[in-house]
Amino acid sequence: MYKAFLIKYGEIGVKGKNRFIFEDALVRQIKFSLKDVEGEFDVRRADGRIYVNALADYDYDEVIESLTRVFGIVGICPVVQIEDNGFDDLANQVINYLDKAYKNKNLTFKVNARRTRKNYPMNSMEINMELGGRILDAFPEMKVDVHKPEVLLQVEIRGDVINIYSIEVPGPGGMPIGTAGKAMLLLSGGIDSPVAGYMVAKRGVQIEATYFHAPPYTSERAKQKVIDLAKIVSKYSGPITLNVVNFTDIQMAIYEKCPHDELTIIMRRYMMKIAEDLGKSSGCQGLVTGESIGQVASQTMASLYCTNEVCTMPVFRPVIGFDKQEIIDISEKIGSYETSIQPFEDCCTIFVAKHPVTKPNLNIIKQHETNLDGVIEELYKTAIETTEKIVIE
């Protein structure tokens, strides 16, 4: 029935002279989201709108599912597009549309007509009234409700084309990917970091990711789990380059030479350093973590202060003020929760002290890090140079 979809967007519409940049980015992201959907589609800007036109048979549910993952979209409207062949033809097309779209006609409705072509022989109010009358004649069981109608029939007269629609599927909102710079996500196998990546991507940030692998203490299953999480996030963010860093030797050196109650803090500081160096080499302008205040010992305010100190670029923590259940709710919504709870440990969960320090002193931490002098430099260089890069689309 539907050969086209009208794409509605929110914040993009107030971007002024730069609006076309955001619209073009949204068009690119829509095309990317549809690349694996069966069928052929033409995505284009026209008359201040974005349209997805189906050029071949397609699966409606699959198209809707793909488009609801595209940041920047606030609404997806399946539309019937007709040529302007006069009001009688329009009325017949509207009646045909309602007959096919709604099996149950015992509904309330409202007609909302809009014209960009002001030389149309009827004004919007006249169109509303005339179409409403024709609908009541065709379907006596339908009733008019101008306040809370069950069917809001939209009729848009744009040039020589008229859009007819009454269904609007909510989109995720946000901004198109790539319109707000690039950031490096520290991605673990937990619940929080995939959600953090999703949330910062929603604001238009292109995502790259770094995962710290510690074989043989962490398994290949743990690594595959993180790859699977990156694939889930990429459904929303677009392609992700996943940097897999072998962290075993650095972790062992910290374990052997530093106080055990400070292991997590010092380890996190080196993770941040490595992620920042990898990010700088690929054009990132910030780091993204899934840290939430007070959730674990390494995420107290004092601990975050210590880990932040090693960074020269900003660190974004999108879930920092969320309760755990709020984070879980988002992870279930985006489809990452079931993967995150698979029981495969990552390097953050091994060599954890029974009583880790919760109020670390930065000066003491830095003093204890000098125990690594003469050892850590070569290990750090090797970790960077041997990083495995996996492109996930």
UniProtKB/Swiss-Prot annotation:
Q: Could you state a single Gene Ontology molecular function term?
A: tRNA binding
| Taxonomic path | Bacteria, Bacillati, Bacillota, Clostridia, Lachnospirales
Q: Where along the sequence do coiled-coil regions lie?
A: none
Q: Pfam families in the record, alphabetically?
A: ThiI (PF02568), ThiI_fer (PF22025), THUMP (PF02926)
Any GO BP annotation: tRNA 4-thiouridine biosynthesis
Instruction: Name the Gene3D superfamilies for this protein.
Output: 3.30.2130.30, HUPs
Q: What is its EC number?
A: 2.8.1.4
Task: Give the main EC class.
Answer: transferase
Q: What are the subcellular locations of this protein?
A: Cytoplasm
Q: Which UniProt keywords apply?
A: ATP-binding, Cytoplasm, Nucleotide-binding, RNA-binding, Thiamine biosynthesis, Transferase, tRNA-binding
Give the source species.
Lachnospira eligens (strain ATCC 27750 / DSM 3376 / VPI C15-48 / C15-B4)
Tell me the HAMAP family matching this sequence.
ThiI
Residues annotated as binding ATP = L186, L187, Y211, F212, R268, G290, Q299
Q: Which reaction does it catalyse?
A: [ThiI sulfur-carrier protein]-S-sulfanyl-L-cysteine + a uridine in tRNA + 2 reduced [2Fe-2S]-[ferredoxin] + ATP + H(+) = [ThiI sulfur-carrier protein]-L-cysteine + a 4-thiouridine in tRNA + 2 oxidized [2Fe-2S]-[ferredoxin] + AMP + diphosphate; [ThiS sulfur-carrier protein]-C-terminal Gly-Gly-AMP + S-sulfanyl-L-cysteinyl-[cysteine desulfurase] + AH2 = [ThiS sulfur-carrier protein]-C-terminal-Gly-aminoethanethioate + L-cysteinyl-[cysteine desulfurase] + A + AMP + 2 H(+)
- Official protein name in the record: Probable tRNA sulfurtransferase
